[in-house]
Amino acid sequence: MRRIGLIPPLYALALAAAVTAPLAAPGYLLIRDAVSTPRSYVTDAALGVGEAAPRAVPQDFFIAVMTVLVDGGVLVKMLLALGLWLAGWGAARLAAQLVPAAGIPGELVAATIAIWNPYVAERLLQGHWSLLVGYGCLPWIALTVIRLRTATNLGAWCPLAFWIAVAGLTPTGTVLALIVGLAAATDRRSRVGVLAISVLAAMPWLVASGLGAAVPAGDAAGVHAFAARAEPGLGTLGSLASLGGMWNASAVPASRTTLFALVFSVVLLIVVAVGAAVLWRARKALGLLGIAVAAVIIPALLATGPGLTLTTWLITEVPGLGILRDGQKWVALAMPAYAVAGAAAVIAVRERSSQYLAAGLACAALIFTLPDLAWGVGGRMTAVKYPSGWNAVAAHINADPHPVAVLPPETMRQYPWGPSSIPVLDPFPRWIRADTVSSGDLRVDGHDVRGDGTRGRQVEELLRAGAAPRELAAHGVGWVVAQADTPGQQAVSSKTLAQLDTAYRDGDIALYRVPGPWNPIAAPPGRRAAVIAAHLVWIALLAAGGVAVLRRQHTRQVGSGGTQDPKICTPDSDN
């Protein structure tokens, strides 16, 4: 039985490996929003107390701490692969819990749906690796909450704390975890527990938002730029229902840019519809099915004219609601229900031998109708190597950290040594001990989306105007980095550079020293201390939950003579 129980996790591992295989090569993940560097540091930006909204906390803090021990490139690639594996394995375990009659065939279908879908492909191409880590935790959260229904000991809550903390690498991940946990809960005690743990996991960005320089209202242009998008032959609703509809048309696999997208969508929705009918008749997973429907319909409505108007009002009038503008990311909430429904579809075939055949056909159809998810989404996601000069410049700045301005000032870059023709976030802010001043302005599908960095925008204007060094120093800038071979509007910034001492220069990058005295722009020590304390609450939740998970798993294996089907720290009851 133990060998049979290993089939779903090994199958999920194979699928995750098929997707992330190119990242096994030496180098760093660098694609659009995904940036990994050899080292990261606990800067104001990493803590979420800079000018920008705390969108990447506690992720950046965690990476900064862990890169003391592990190279950042290795760490991020491992976490991404782990997130996909957890999605598939967790979906299989959730299916085994809710529809045990589906057996191994059903678990394999569930794992396939969780990993092999347009949501994963499009978020990979957008570089949302940490969102995918949270996505991978969703079925585990649902499974753990379901098993809490009959738990009597406090230790049974430890796995839930662990999974919500892992999902909470990003603010969006915490919200996803909270919604899935509440949907899976059936009693008040479980709902209160899910809410309490989610609040603790959210402490880093809640405290950072409360104590930051400001929680900026969103830019109205961003609502249209980040709205869910219709894919060929599907419309917006069909795209979202098939787990696609990414706002960025460039971050879409080739198979979703033609009418071939309709083929995968039909296959997926037939499998899910058959299984959903089985679940409905059995009164199973109704909460998960409910949020799946909402996760498809609500973003579709928000992408309409009235929906865009409502979203614009919300994010411009209510600070902190910018998290709502990317409507398609909430489709992740549909994955647990889709996976369980896929498993339940197997039950419609009564003969066990026929169930294996049906499951095999379903898995093959899903994979072959989205063929370019394999091998790094058709080879577009690869590991890159930084030029040697970048490390030298980082070493100079880290030896004497002062805020840094970067030329060209655009937020996104295109490097000849980077992923071919794919824009990427500037990696430099995550590589140095000092904060980088930047406006954060973006241009998305012809829309100019204003960022949060007021000081950064002022510094960019000074550089474009060829301002004197003392004006940069008055804004706290101690270094200027000029990156070669990446497009951008530098205007007459060369006038400013000509007045600065060159600390380093090669064909790829140059570093200039701005003479002091510099106006300090760091966050007050008290604010940093409070936000660090909030991050430590999240770390404690993660560590305590993780230790309890390992201890309970060890106890279960010892108690069963080491022959029990592998699980991750669950309460003794499977009801």
Language model regions located:
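Aromatic-rich transmembrane-lumenal/periplasmic boundary elements in polytopic membrane proteins
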Residues: 11-51, 194-241, 401-425, 430
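Signature aromatic-anchored transmembrane alpha helix within multi-pass, membrane-resident enzymes
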Residues: 101, 182, 199, 343-372, ...
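Membrane-embedded helix bundles of polyisoprenyl
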Residues: 18, 85-98, 103-186, 191-209, ...
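Membrane-helix boundary/interfacial segments in multi-pass membrane proteins
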Residues: 47, 120-132, 254-259, 289-341, ...
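Hydrophobic, aromatic-rich transmembrane alpha-helices
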Residues: 193, 245, 261-296, 347, ...
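Extracytoplasmic
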Residues: 9-13, 219-221, 365-575
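Membrane-interface coil-to-helix junctions
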Residues: 12-88, 112, 116-124, 129-135
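Periplasmic/ER-lumenal interhelical loops and adjacent helix-loop junctions
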Residues: 46-47, 195, 203-279, 464, ...
